[in-house]
């Protein structure tokens, strides 16, 4: 299934910087309106408890639909995949505006939050597959990994600066105004990233192929899973890392019920991405995909262990306690996507890459729908420690399974 890299990547310097600029703005916008941290925290903080628990399952259901649609969307977009990114960013911004303007009380507000999360899942899934396919077409393997890590770091720094110096001016000391201002800035960032996407330009000529139906998409995915051992390992490992990816949402819900500050979570999450960028870059160079995944799972387990100690000692309400846990959870999450892309982008044939990414992401979304609802519910049982123990056990299982990942991306 391996396919050689396209020649003359070294001559393409401009695409990297345009992709980095667009990705940085998009990352900052996503950080300020983060569906895994900001929206669940706001919902729980303002009394929309059941909605807070349902946000990630709703997002996952939308993600299932989005990943099912992504192969067809890529084929319809053809070489103009940058336009697909632009439209996706504009829709994402509009959805965040809906959350920002609705009164945060009652069933109607809860329904809006849930529906926006579901719609966001669709849009983000299509956008993610399109973005990964676009950078795979424009950049070499090394530059792809570098882009994913660096854009996350710079975008996070931008999010921290906005959170510290701009959002407080919008809030005027009022908590609700502060939360709404955060969402408005996030929407503005997403809209700006949509404009930047227009300047990315079309991809190189894509392979002509017939448009596949949903059934054909999954038929191809299962066929590759049966015939290619590397893809089976990739899918199983991705499924078991779903709890690691849910870590920040889990701790956001626990923090919202115990007096934590949203601005602290946004800043700490952004710092975690900044610190994680050079860390995982070094790990990838020395230990490859396996090192990134094992390290990610172990850091997630460390976050859970620290949370257990802090809650047992009555220290969870302190900024240093929940801030440290959030920092570790964010660092752990940051390695998962980059490692997965490094694993699949070289081994998958170019004409099947988008389909296989969408197929695997759909399976992960199915698991996350069930797991997210369960973890979202137990996370709000803040008077007991056993929910954190569950997260610790799942992280350890992920660490053990990830030992089967290749040390290098080309090692099947």
Language-model regions, residue ranges each:
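C-terminal transmembrane helical hairpin of 12-TM major facilitator-type secondary transporters
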Residues: 291-337
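Loop-to-transmembrane helix entry/capping segments in MFS-fold secondary transporters
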Residues: 49-50, 141-150, 350-360
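Transmembrane alpha-helix termini and helix-breaking/packing motifs in multi-pass membrane transporters
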Residues: 39-45, 72-76, 100-104, 159-178, ...
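Helix-to-loop junctions at the C-terminal end of transmembrane segments
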Residues: 66-80, 170, 276-290, 379-380
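C-terminal ends and interior cores of transmembrane alpha-helices
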Residues: 89-107, 299-316
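Helix-loop junctions on the cytosolic side of multi-pass membrane transporters
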Residues: 194-211, 403-412
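Intracellular juxtamembrane helix-capping segments at the cytosolic ends
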Residues: 125-139, 334-348
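Helix-loop boundary and gating motifs at the non-cytosolic
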Residues: 2-65, 230-267
């Amino acid at each position: 299934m391996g396919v050689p890299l396209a020649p003359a990547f070294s001559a393409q310097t401009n695409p990297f910087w345009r992709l980095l600029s667009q990705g940085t703005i998009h990352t900052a916008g996503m950080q300020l309106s983060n569906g895994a941290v900001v929206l669940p925290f706001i919902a729980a903080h303002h009394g929309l408890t059941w909605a807070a628990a349902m946000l990630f399952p709703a997002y996952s259901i939308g993600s299932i639909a989005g990943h099912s649609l992504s192969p067809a969307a890529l084929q319809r977009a053809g070489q103009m995949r940058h336009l697909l990114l632009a439209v996706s960013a504009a829709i994402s911004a509009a959805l965040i505006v809906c959350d920002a303007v609705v009164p945060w009380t009652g069933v109607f507000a809860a329904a809006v939050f849930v529906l926006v999360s579901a719609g966001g899942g669709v849009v983000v899934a299509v956008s993610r597959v399109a973005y990964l396919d676009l950078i795979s077409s424009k950049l070499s393997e090394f530059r792809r990994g570098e882009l994913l890590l660096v854009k996350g770091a710079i975008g996070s720094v931008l999010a921290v600066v906005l959170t510290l110096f701009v959002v407080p001016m919008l809030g005027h000391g009022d908590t609700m105004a502060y939360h709404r201002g955060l969402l408005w800035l996030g929407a503005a960032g997403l809209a700006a990233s949509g404009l930047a996407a227009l300047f990315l330009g079309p991809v190189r000529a894509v392979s002509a192929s017939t448009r596949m139906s949903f059934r054909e998409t999954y038929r191809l995915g299962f066929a590759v899973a049966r015939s290619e051992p590397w893809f089976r390992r990739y899918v199983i490992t991705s499924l078991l890392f779903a709890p690691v990816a849910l870590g920040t949402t889990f701790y956001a819900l626990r923090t919202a019920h115990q007096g934590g500050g949203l601005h602290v979570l946004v800043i700490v999450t952004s710092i975690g991405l900044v610190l994680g960028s050079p860390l995982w870059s070094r790990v990838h160079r020395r230990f490859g995909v396996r090192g990134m995944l094992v390290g990610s799972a172990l850091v997630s387990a460390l976050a859970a262990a620290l949370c257990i100690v802090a809650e047992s000692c009555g220290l969870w309400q302190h900024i240093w306690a929940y801030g440290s846990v959030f920092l570790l959870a964010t660092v752990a999450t940051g390695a998962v996507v980059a490692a997965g892309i490094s694993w699949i982008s070289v081994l998958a044939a170019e004409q099947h890459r988008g389909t296989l990414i969408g197929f695997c992401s759909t399976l992960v979304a199915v698991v996350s729908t069930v797991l997210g609802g369960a973890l979202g519910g137990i996370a709000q049982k803040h008077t007991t420690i056993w929910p954190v123990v569950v997260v610790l056990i799942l992280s350890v299982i992920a660490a053990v399974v990830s030992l089967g990942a290749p040390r290098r991306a080309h090692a099947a």
